[in-house]
């Protein structure tokens, strides 16, 4: 009989011949296996170490022979039955009848039915003469089938690693329970090989396989429930658990920081699933003293508007919206022209971005539990959205200039740069505000970038072109002083002005300085001159 074709397939780093449907199930159910193993197929959960109880034969067969399997899938499942030993030989024969109904047959059927060792060895000799990978698989399969004891079977299974089929070897060792004290180091090497193969694309399963299941705390359980369909009760429970500082001493600065970033992470999670109502609920639930510690000084005053602004960007970067509509509320648009407010907003955004660090919570929990999109992809888009928000605030008034645009190497090509710039102009600089230094005005659409980034980079835009009047340009040091609220010292040497200001500042006691400058920092007024 002509040998069956034995292929090696790769699913997200998992190379396999014997268990392709197990690998495929793993690819689509990573989070289920890692965080809700009780709801996953027990065969898969057992292989990755999520559960201790071994699967039943039926649970294994459900993976080996899925419904509507084609002849190739059935033939591969029959190979796995032979490798799994005598307990599965009856299933091997029964599934051959199903294969016959599709006008196919397994190449080892006659030899296995009679268990004619000469026929089996003859097949093995012929397969060794062929140089292809599928012939090597057949040779190893025959040797596993003919092995006389557990030790010999283990050695033959290890030969699969020479074909980079470490995953198949690990599954067979696990199901056949071949690991013992003598071969523990070899099994560990195979396990590490599998971890290395899946680490990049399946980090949760790699972590599970390497470290085993961890005891899930209450916060992790709550985080694992999708927020998108949740009520405020779930968020309130999360906030209450995180804010429970009974075990945190007043002097534990690092633990307080950790608590802050956990709460910020919750705020981000609610926004990225477009549940801004839960974001507001979470803010109201956080105790005032903790909230003031998270967002000190000016930050607390602009917090809600900043979160609204960021929420709009999340919707665009996560493809929930195609336009930058209603990018910022009017109060935000008016406030952002103040240098100290911009500095405070950037502080909020930087903190929210840092809260995405995987070490904020004790266990790895995806940002959007149950999402079909990889957590790494989602995290990347969320970080890009926050980076975009920081860029908008930092480049306020010059967002269309060449220097500003060149700071967008991270920008997602799916988001039109032209539309972003236009939206900033509409949402932020179209508010009619006039005072002694700033004159915002709406400008014609044609003056913006025409959808061509290269064209914009070749053009040196003027402040008028991008909606900012010439009055924004600080022409001399006297005007800088007027903006900062200093008196006109134009007749005195600049050195004396600086000296006079410095001496007065030094005479102010520390508590007053903190009250005046809030969370911005006592030493930061001088360092922020670049914003003006």
Curated annotation (Swiss-Prot):
Gene Ontology CC entries for this record: P granule
Primary residence: cytoplasm
Listed GO biological process terms: oogenesis
Record note on disruption phenotype: Viable, and not temperature sensitive. Triple knockout with pgl-1 and pgl-3 results in 58% of progeny arresting as late embryos and 5% as larvae at 26 degrees Celsius.
Tissue expression summary: Highly expressed in the germline.
Entry keyword set: Developmental protein, Differentiation, Oogenesis
Subcellular location: Cytoplasmic granule
Complexes and interactors: Interacts with pgl-1 and pgl-3; association with either pgl-1 or pgl-3 is not required for P-granule localization.
Function: Transient component of P-granule which is involved in germline development.
Protein name: P granule abnormality protein 2
Organism: Caenorhabditis elegans
Gene name of the record: pgl-2
């Amino acid at each position: 009989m002509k040998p069956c074709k034995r292929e090696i397939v790769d699913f997200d780093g998992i190379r396999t011949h014997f268990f392709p449907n197990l690998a495929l199930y793993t690819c689509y159910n990573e989070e289920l296996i890692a965080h809700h193993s009780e709801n996953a197929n027990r065969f898969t959960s057992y292989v990755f170490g999520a559960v201790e109880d071994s699967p039943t034969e039926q649970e294994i067969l459900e993976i080996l022979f899925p419904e509507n399997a084609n002849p190739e899938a059935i033939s591969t499942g029959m190979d796995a039955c032979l490798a799994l030993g005598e307990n599965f030989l009856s299933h091997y024969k029964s599934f051959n009848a199903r294969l016959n109904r599709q006008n196919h047959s397994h190449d080892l059927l006659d030899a296995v039915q009679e268990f004619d060792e000469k026929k089996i060895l003859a097949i093995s000799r012929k397969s060794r003469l062929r140089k292809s990978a599928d012939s090597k698989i057949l040779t190893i399969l025959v040797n596993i089938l003919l092995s006389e004891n557990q030790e010999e079977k283990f050695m033959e299974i290890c030969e699969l690693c020479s074909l980079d089929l470490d995953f198949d070897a690990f599954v067979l060792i696990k199901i056949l329970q071949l690991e013992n004290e003598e071969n523990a180091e070899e099994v560990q090497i195979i396990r590490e090989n599998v971890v290395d193969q899946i680490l990049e694309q399946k980090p949760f399963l790699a972590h599970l396989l390497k470290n085993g299941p961890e005891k899930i705390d209450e916060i992790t359980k709550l985080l694992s429930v999708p927020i998108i369909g949740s009520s405020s009760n779930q968020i309130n429970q999360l906030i209450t658990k995180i804010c429970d500082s009974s075990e945190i001493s007043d002097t534990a600065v690092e633990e307080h920081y950790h608590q802050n970033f956990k709460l910020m992470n919750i705020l981000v999670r609610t926004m990225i699933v477009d549940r801004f109502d839960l974001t507001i609920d979470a803010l109201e639930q956080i105790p005032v003293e903790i909230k003031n510690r998270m967002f000190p000084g000016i930050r607390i005053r602009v917090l809600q508007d900043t979160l609204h602004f960021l929420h709009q960007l999340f919707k665009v970067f996560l493809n929930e919206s195609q336009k930058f509509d209603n990018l910022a509320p009017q109060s935000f648009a008016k406030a952002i022209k103040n240098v100290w407010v911009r500095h405070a907003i950037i502080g909020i955004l930087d903190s929210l971005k840092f809260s995405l660090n995987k070490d904020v919570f004790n266990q790895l929990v995806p940002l959007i539990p149950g999402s079909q999109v990889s957590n790494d992809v989602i995290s990347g888009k969320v970080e890009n959205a926050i980076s975009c928000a920081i860029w908008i605030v930092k480049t306020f008034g010059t967002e269309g200039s060449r220097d500003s645009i060149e700071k967008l190497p991270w920008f997602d090509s799916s988001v039109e740069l032209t539309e972003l710039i236009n939206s900033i102009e509409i949402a932020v600089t179209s508010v009619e505000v006039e005072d002694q230094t700033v004159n915002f005005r709406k400008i014609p659409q044609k003056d913006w970038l025409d959808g061509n980034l290269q064209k914009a980079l070749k053009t040196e835009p003027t402040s008028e072109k991008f909606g900012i009047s010439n009055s924004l340009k600080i022409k001399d040091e006297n005007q800088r002083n007027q903006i900062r609220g200093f008196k006109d010292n134009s007749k005195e040497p600049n050195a004396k002005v600086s000296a006079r200001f410095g001496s007065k500042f030094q005479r102010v006691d520390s508590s007053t300085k903190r009250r005046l400058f809030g969370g911005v920092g006592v030493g930061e007024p001088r360092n922020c001159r670049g914003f003006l």
